[in-house]
C-alpha cells in the first residue's frame, strides 16, 4: 500500500512539475524550471528505493529457543511474494499457506523441538531475505490429562482437572496455556492441589445446561525447570440436572434431591464415632462408580493384623480420593439409621446402594454434616468445594508444594 501511494505521489509531482514548467515558460525564468525537474527526479528515485525492500521474516537470523508452537510469517514489502521455502536441517520442507493477495506467507504445521530451520523468501521485485533459527531444546517434556472426559454430562459440582505427567515449576505459564470457555459465562478460577495437579472451578455450583470447553495448549510452552509441554489436549462437557445428597449424622439418614425435589431418604451408617474413623464433614464430589470392587484397608494404612480388611463390595460410589464411598453393606443393615460402624464410608443396604449409584453421576454433590469428624480436606481430590472461594479466587500459582 505504501508503494501504491508513492507512485501516486510521483505522478502528482510530475503533473505539478509540468504546470510549473508551463508557468515559468511564460515568465521566461528557466532556472526555476531546472529546480523543478531535479525535484521530480529526486522523488522518482525515492519511490524506486522504497519499492526495493526485501520481504520481512517474523524471526531473526540466528534466533534460538524459538517457540515451536508459534507460526512463522513472511510479509512482502513490494508487489507480492514469488517464492518462499522453509526447510529443517534434514531438508524437509514445512507446509505453508499463502494469502489470497500473495503478500503474506505462514507456516501451516507445528514445528518440532530441537530443530534448525532455514527460510528463503523472494519478492516479485527480485529482493530476497534469508533467516536461520533453532527451536527450543527441552530437558524433558510432559503431557496433561484432562477431566471430565469429552462429551460427558456431569453434575453441578464438577471441577475441571489438569494432571501433568511431571511436576510443574512455572505454574503461571501452565495456567496461561489453558483456556476455559463457558456458555453462559461464569466466574471461575485456577487452584493447584499440588505441583502436578491443577483445578478450575466456578465461584458457585454450575447452572444445569451450561456448556464448557477446555483447551490446554501446552505444546511449545516452557513450564519451568527445563520441562516443556509435549502435546496439546482438549475436552468439553455439559452440566446436567442438579443432583445433591445430604447425609446427616444427626438423623443417620441420607436424602437425595434432583433439581430441588426429594427423591429418596435412606438410613445410613457413617464412620465410627472416633477421631480416627469418623466420616469427615463437608462437600464431596461424586467420582467413579463401581458396580463391584475390592475394598482393602491396607490402601490407607490399616494392616490386616490391626483389624484391617479386604472385602468385596457392591455398588461402590466414590466420594473422595482418600477412600470414602457410598456402598452396599448388608452386614451393617441393622446399624443403619441407628449407629455408626464403618471405617469412614457411608454404609447403606444393597438395594439403596444400587439405587443411589444409578441416581447420581460424576460431579454431583454429597454434603456430610453433624459427624464428630473434621472437614474433608480441600486437597483430597474430590473436596475442592471445601476451599472457600475467597481463598480459591486468589490462586496459588506463585507457590510450590513439597509434592
From Swiss-Prot:
InterPro entries: Big_10, LD-transpeptidase, LD_TPept_cat_dom, Transpep_catalytic_dom
Any one of the GO CC terms: plasma membrane
Main location: membrane
Entries under Gene3D superfamilies matching the protein: 2.60.40.3710, 2.60.40.3780, L,D-transpeptidase catalytic domain-like
Lipid attachment residues per UniProt (N-palmitoyl cysteine): 29
Record SUPFAM superfamilies: L,D-transpeptidase catalytic domain-like
GO terms under biological process: cell wall organization; peptidoglycan-protein cross-linking; regulation of cell shape
Cleavable signal peptide: 1-28
Single GO molecular function: peptidoglycan L,D-transpeptidase activity
CDD domains: LDT_IgD_like_2 (cd13432), YkuD_like (cd16913)
Disordered, as annotated region: 35-67
Similarity section: Belongs to the YkuD family.
Role this protein plays: May play a role in cell wall biology.
Protein name in UniProt: Putative L,D-transpeptidase LppS
UniProt gene name: lppS
Amino acid at each position: 500500500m505504501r508503494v501504491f501511494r508513492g507512485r501516486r505521489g510521483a505522478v502528482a509531482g510530475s503533473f505539478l512539475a509540468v504546470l510549473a514548467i508551463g508557468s515559468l515558460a511564460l515568465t521566461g525564468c528557466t532556472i526555476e524550471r531546472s529546480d523543478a525537474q531535479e525535484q521530480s527526479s529526486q522523488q522518482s528515485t525515492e519511490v524506486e528505493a522504497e519499492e526495493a525492500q526485501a520481504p520481512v521474516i517474523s524471526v531473526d537470523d540466528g534466533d534460538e529457543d524459538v517457540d515451536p508452537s508459534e507460526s512463522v510469517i513472511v510479509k512482502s514489502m513490494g508487489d507480492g511474494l514469488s517464492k518462499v521455502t522453509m526447510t529443517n536441517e534434514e531438508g524437509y520442507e514445512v507446509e505453508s499457506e499463502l494469502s489470497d493477495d500473495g503478500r503474506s506467507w505462514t507456516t501451516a504445521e507445528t514445528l518440532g523441538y530441537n530443530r534448525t530451520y532455514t527460510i528463503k523468501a523472494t519478492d516479485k521485485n527480485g529482493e530476497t531475505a534469508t533467516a536461520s533459527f533453532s527451536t527450543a531444546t527441552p530437558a524433558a517434556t510432559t503431557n496433561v490429562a484432562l477431566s471430565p472426559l469429552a462429551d460427558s454430562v456431569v453434575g453441578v459440582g464438577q471441577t475441571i482437572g489438569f494432571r501433568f505427567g511431571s511436576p510443574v515449576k512455572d505454574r503461571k505459564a501452565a495456567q496461561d496455556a489453558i483456556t476455559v470457555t463457558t456458555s453462559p459465562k461464569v466466574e471461575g478460577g485456577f487452584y493447584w492441589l499440588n505441583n502436578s495437579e491443577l483445578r478450575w472451578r466456578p465461584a458457585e455450583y454450575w447452572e444445569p445446561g451450561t456448556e464448557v470447553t477446555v483447551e490446554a495448549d501446552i505444546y511449545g510452552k516452557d513450564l519451568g525447570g527445563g520441562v516443556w509441554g509435549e502435546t496439546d489436549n482438549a475436552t468439553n462437557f455439559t452440566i446436567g440436572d442438579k443432583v445433591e445428597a445430604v447425609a446427616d449424622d444427626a438423623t443417620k439418614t441420607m436424602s437425595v434431591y434432583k433439581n430441588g425435589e426429594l427423591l429418596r431418604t435412606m438410613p445410613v451408617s457413617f464412620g465410627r464415632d472416633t477421631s480416627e474413623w469418623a466420616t469427615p464433614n463437608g462437600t464431596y464430589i461424586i467420582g467413579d462408580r463401581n458396580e463391584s470392587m475390592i475394598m482393602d484397608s491396607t490402601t490407607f494404612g490399616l494392616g490386616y493384623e490391626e483389624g484391617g480388611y479386604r472385602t468385596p463390595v457392591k455398588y461402590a460410589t466414590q466420594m473422595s480420593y482418600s477412600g470414602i464411598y457410598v456402598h452396599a453393606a448388608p452386614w451393617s443393615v441393622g446399624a443403619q439409621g441407628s449407629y455408626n460402624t464403618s471405617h469412614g464410608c457411608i454404609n447403606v443396604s444393597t438395594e439403596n446402594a444400587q439405587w443411589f449409584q444409578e441416581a447420581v453421576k460424576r460431579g454431583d454433590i454429597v454434603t456430610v454434616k453433624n459427624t464428630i469428624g473434621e472437614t474433608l480436606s480441600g486437597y483430597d481430590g474430590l473436596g475442592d468445594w471445601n476451599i472457600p472461594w475467597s481463598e480459591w479466587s486468589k490462586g496459588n500459582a506463585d507457590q510450590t508444594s513439597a509434592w
